[in-house]
Amino acid sequence: MTDTAASASQPALVRNELNLVWLDMEMTGLDPDNDRIIEIAVVVTNSTLDIAVEGPVFAIHQSDETLAKMDDWNKSTHGRSGLIDRVRASTVTEAEAAAQLQAFLAQYVSPGKSPMCGNSICQDRRFMARWMPEFERFFHYRNLDVSTLKELCRRWQPAIYKGFQKRAMHTALADIHESIDELKYYREHFLIPAASVSAGESAPAA
């Protein structure tokens, strides 16, 4: 799939060091030493999540032998979504996908500036460090993990936690947009707004 530009109804995203890079992968399993990446997508937003630009979405070719090692859940989920067929038909390698994604992201944010953003993103980062190490170094060492807020909300405000229902599409681009929507939900319903600064006062140093 090719990259999708920002919609005509919203302003174009301007290159800025505060922009956020959202990422999601689908893998054949959970172990980066034995499993492989089969799909990857990115979305860039501004810092307030108001503007979003979709990057390329790649199904990564893997051998039939690799696909055969998937457990029943992965075979069922990725078969139902059509991803397994896309992986078999793809000619894109992990290295080729990483290079194109990095070139796309460089239009919107400098290397080393954006945390890696998503849900349970450290798992994606483990696979990236194993199979796309140069691309992994494009990101800041910090992560912006929506699942942190999810776990806190589940314990501290269970009623609010239950208010966001995930669709569980298990396709990379759909999962990214769901993560962004989930963070917006927690910002509105769970996070405490910053106190307004009175006229003439300065905000405290970070």
Curated annotation (Swiss-Prot):
GO terms for molecular function: 3'-5'-RNA exonuclease activity; nucleic acid binding. Keywords: Cytoplasm, Exonuclease, Hydrolase, Nuclease. The keyword Oxidoreductase does not apply. GO terms for cellular component: cytoplasm. This is Oligoribonuclease. GO terms for biological process: DNA metabolic process. It comes from the Bacteria.
